[in-house]
Amino acid sequence: MLLVNKKILTLLFSICTISLLAILYLNFKKREIIIPGSYKEAMTYVKKIPLSEVQEKINNKEDFILFIGRESCPYCQKFAPKLAVAIQKTNQTVYYLDNDSKERKEITSFAHDMNVKTVPNLSSFKKGSKENYLTKGSKSSIDEIIELLTQ
């Protein structure tokens, strides 16, 4: 009887150890940072929304981060992978207005109203008002992007 209990305890201990190692491995693997190789790949880390939803967030006085850019912009192409890395490191939601979309005129007008002079533009909104933005645009470092995302 004692031998059977010892075998059961050993088996349970082994199962627990293997389970713990599997959980740790999966958690570590999940935290691997992927550096996107293209603008399109980088944009899989943002949530693309239409201008009407951005205006709704402003009207509802929400806190959010907004990226305005376009694939045809070489500066946006340089910035997008850094943004994707920062998003992965902070796990923040970043909304994306695509200035190459059908809403281009409306987005350009909105950007002008928000005092956005160039793309890429990453801005934080607090209670529906633009509070801060990256002044260096595509020249911003990953750490500077992270700082804006975590304010």
What residues fall within each predicted segment?
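N-terminal targeting signals for export/organelle localization
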Residues: M1-T44, Q151
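Thiol-based oxidoreductase modules, predominantly thioredoxin-like and allied folds used
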Residues: Y45-K48, I68, Q92-I107
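Extracytoplasmic/secreted envelope proteins and their assembly/folding machinery
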Residues: Q55, A80, A84-I87, I107-A111, ...
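Local sequence-structure signature of Cys/Sec-based thiol-disulfide redox active-site neighborhoods
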Residues: Q55-Q92
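Solvent-exposed loop/turn segments at secondary-structure junctions
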Residues: E71-P74, D100-E103, S129-K130
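Extracytoplasmic/secreted cell-surface and envelope-processing proteins
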Residues: Y75-Q77, E106-I107, E131-L134
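Short Fe-S-cluster ligation motifs
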Residues: K102-P120
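Non-catalytic, surface beta->alpha helical segment in thiol-disulfide oxidoreductase systems
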Residues: S123-Q151
